[in-house]
């Protein structure tokens, strides 16, 4: 029994050691430094949200680092209309390596979502996720249109103080089909009103001519 207990303790100790590999350690001559290798979007022009941001960071130091921060989205004079979190899970970047962090802005109207059928995500013939527009009229005030600027602000600890990392990217949301439909509706309305006014004016002039 003592041998069994000792073996269990040894197993637990080995397992515990494996879990603690990335715990912070005071390394002599430790260098903590992070650079932005890329701050980009999956595209620059959108008809509707979502917009997915990719932040690629490079750890140029010799110890692992877990930077965190936010992306602040502005639209003209409207500041911070959305705030997205980066690296919420506190994922580490290993020394001399890159790591990508993604964050998605989907707070719009309408918005593309994954098509779900029978509780499963629908894929097309090429294995890509099929998406469809979700029209939640309670979010009608969140119709996005125009130029947007995303400003990234991350922070990491260099061992002495918090070091900021910044980046900026711009993109456009143009719901062109909604604009086209609205234009056509307005055009028909204008033609209808114009025809009605012309008809009324013609009848009035004819009536005046008879009298």
Label each region the model flagged.
Residues 201-211:
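Cytoplasmic C-terminal tails of single-pass
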Residues 4-39, 176:
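Surface-exposed, gly/pro-biased binding rims or lids
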Residues 119, 127, 192, 206-208:
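Short, flexible coil/linker elements and helix-boundary hinge sites characteristic
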Residues 27-180:
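Membrane-proximal extracellular "stem/stalk" segments
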């Amino acid at each position: 029994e003592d041998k069994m207990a000792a073996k269990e303790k040894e197993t637990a100790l080995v397992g515990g050691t494996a879990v603690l590999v990335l715990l912070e350690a005071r390394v002599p001559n430790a260098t903590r430094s992070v650079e932005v290798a890329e701050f980009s979007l999956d595209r620059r022009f959108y008809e509707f949200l979502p917009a997915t941001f990719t932040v690629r960071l490079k750890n140029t130091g010799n110890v692992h680092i877990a930077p965190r921060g936010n992306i602040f989205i502005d639209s003209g004079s409207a500041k911070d209309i959305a705030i997205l979190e980066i690296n919420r899970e506190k994922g580490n970047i290993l020394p001399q390596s890159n790591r990508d962090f993604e964050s998605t802005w989907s707070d719009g109207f309408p918005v593309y979502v994954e098509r779900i059928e029978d509780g499963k995500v629908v894929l097309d013939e090429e294995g890509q996720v099929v998406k469809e527009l979700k029209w939640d009229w309670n979010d009608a005030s969140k119709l996005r249109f125009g130029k947007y600027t995303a400003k990234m602000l991350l922070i990491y600890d260099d061992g002495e103080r918090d070091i900021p990392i910044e980046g900026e990217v711009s993109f456009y949301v143009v719901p062109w089909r909604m604009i086209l439909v609205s234009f056509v509706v307005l055009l028909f309305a204008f033609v209808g009103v114009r025809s009605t006014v012309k008809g009324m004016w013609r009848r009035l002039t004819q009536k005046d001519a008879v009298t």
